[in-house]
Amino acid sequence: MGVPSGLILCVLIGAFFISMAAAGDSGAYDWVMPARSGGGCKGSIGECIAEEEEFELDSESNRRILATKKYISYGALQKNSVPCSRRGASYYNCKPGAQANPYSRGCSAITRCRS
């Protein structure tokens, strides 16, 4: 009388999981179930990247990457320049006494303003 194939399969799977449990955190079976770090980095990209990796790109590469975005102005891409050196002033309106955020949407149904 032969041994059922289902029983052999169950024994093999059980032996596999027992060997994984015995390996513990040695990393021998990371290809099956990769270990995950519980915390991870929850800060900004600059805080999560190691300091030596953060500044690997030269300034020309950084300017080219920033130039592909539509919301970066040509003035912001100038080398060694500060957009507005006045403390607390908006980058868009650097005049003394100017509003920091002068943008205002008009009254429409989506803004739910009352007239």
Swiss-Prot record:
Q: Which GO terms describe its molecular function?
A: hormone activity; receptor ligand activity
Q: Which UniProt keywords apply?
A: Disulfide bond, Hormone, Secreted, Signal
Maturation-removed propeptide residues: 24-66
Principal place of residence: secreted
* Site location (Required for proteolytic cleavage): 63-64
One Gene Ontology cellular component term attached to this UniProt record is: extracellular region
- Share the record's PTM remark: Proteolytically cleaved, probably by S1P, a subtilisin-like serine protease (subtilase).
InterPro entries per UniProt: RALF (IPR008801)
Protein localization: Secreted
Q: Where is the signal peptide?
A: 1-23
Share an example GO biological-process annotation for this protein.
Answer: regulation of signaling receptor activity
One Pfam family this sequence matches: RALF
| Cell division as UniProt keyword | no
The entry's function note states: Cell signaling peptide that may regulate plant stress, growth, and development. Mediates a rapid alkalinization of extracellular space by mediating a transient increase in the cytoplasmic Ca(2+) concentration leading to a calcium-dependent signaling events through a cell surface receptor and a concomitant activation of some intracellular mitogen-activated protein kinases. Prevents root growth and seedling development in heterologous system.
Q: What is this protein called?
A: Rapid alkalinization factor
